[in-house]
Structure formats: C-alpha cells, structure tokens
C-alpha cells in the first residue's frame, strides 16, 4: 500500500505487537482452543504484513489457505479430541514408536542422499531464456505460476508432501 510514512510505521508497529501477543498466546495459553484462536490472529497479522508490502495475491492466499483452512482444521481437531480421555493411558515410548522413528529417520537420510547426489540440470523443463514475455503484460498470478513451475518447483513439492503427511496424521488422530 502506498501510505504516508508515519501511518505505515504505525501499522507496522501495531501488526508487530499483534504478532508478538498472538505468538505468546499460542505458546502460553493452556486452553488449546484459545491457543488456536491466537494462531489465527498471528496468521491474519502476517497476511496484513503482506498487504502492507504490496503483495496482495500472497495476502489473499495466506488468508484463504492458512486462516480459512489450516486454522479451522486445527480447531476442528482440537474440539474433536477429548483431552482427558486422550492423556489417560499416555505412554512416553513404545516399541512401535521406536520402529516408526527408525523407519522415518532412514527414509529421511535416504531422501537427503538422493537429493544431494542428483544432477538437477536436465530436470528443469523451462528456463528464463526461453520465455519471451514482456514483464508488463504478465499479471502477478501468471508470474507466480511461472516461478512455481521453474524456480520453486522442488520447494513447492516438498510443501505438498508435508501437507499430505499432516493430513494423514490428522486423520489417524481422529480415528483413535
């Protein structure tokens, strides 16, 4: 946003305080529902930071994805679980946990070695030299699509895998 300097600075300080207070609420509040609402405040403040830095598409994506979907999913999972029954028979470490952590650690080490030993030169399909597009004619959404399919392809896939694992974990927790 093109705001005058003092108003922009005031909004930055106000949003920074909102982030700090919301983050403290996430960590320090004992009720998980209030903690999830504090997380929603933090995510809304982050999206407002994006609006202040003229990244309107990223701000809208932040609101839709994180506040609208992830935070609602967290609230649903917290409200779905009964805390007193969930921690009644809580064992710190079992054989299944050790086996699972061993398998996950070995898969992680295997993925890291495969990624570090792979030559990524031939994998990228398009390069910037082949794109003969005027920057003024391309919208922000198209620029984001171009960057996601070229420069940020691997991190984008990592994030999708992490979200898939989180979804499977939420389903497994809800079935218990």
UniProtKB/Swiss-Prot annotation:
It holds the Pfam family Oxidored_q3. InterPro entries: NAD(P)H-Q_Oxidoreduct_6, NADH_UbQ/plastoQ_OxRdtase_su6, Nuo/plastoQ_OxRdtase_6_NuoJ. One of its GO terms (molecular function) is quinone binding. It is found in: Plastid, Chloroplast thylakoid membrane. NDH shuttles electrons from NAD(P)H:plastoquinone, via FMN and iron-sulfur (Fe-S) centers, to quinones in the photosynthetic chain and possibly in a chloroplast respiratory chain. The immediate electron acceptor for the enzyme in this species is believed to be plastoquinone. Couples the redox reaction to proton translocation, and thus conserves the redox energy in a proton gradient. The chain crosses the membrane at residues 10-30, 32-52, 61-81, 95-115, 152-172. This is NAD(P)H-quinone oxidoreductase subunit 6, chloroplastic. Belongs to the complex I subunit 6 family. Its EC number is 7.1.1.-. It is a multi-pass membrane protein. GO terms for cellular component: chloroplast thylakoid membrane. It catalyses: a plastoquinone + NADH + (n+1) H(+)(in) = a plastoquinol + NAD(+) + n H(+)(out); a plastoquinone + NADPH + (n+1) H(+)(in) = a plastoquinol + NADP(+) + n H(+)(out). It is an enzyme of class 7 (translocase). Keywords: Chloroplast, Membrane, NAD, NADP, Plastid, Plastoquinone, Quinone, Thylakoid, Translocase, Transmembrane, Transmembrane helix, Transport. It comes from Populus trichocarpa (Western balsam poplar). The gene is ndhG. Coiled coil: none annotated. NDH is composed of at least 16 different subunits, 5 of which are encoded in the nucleus.
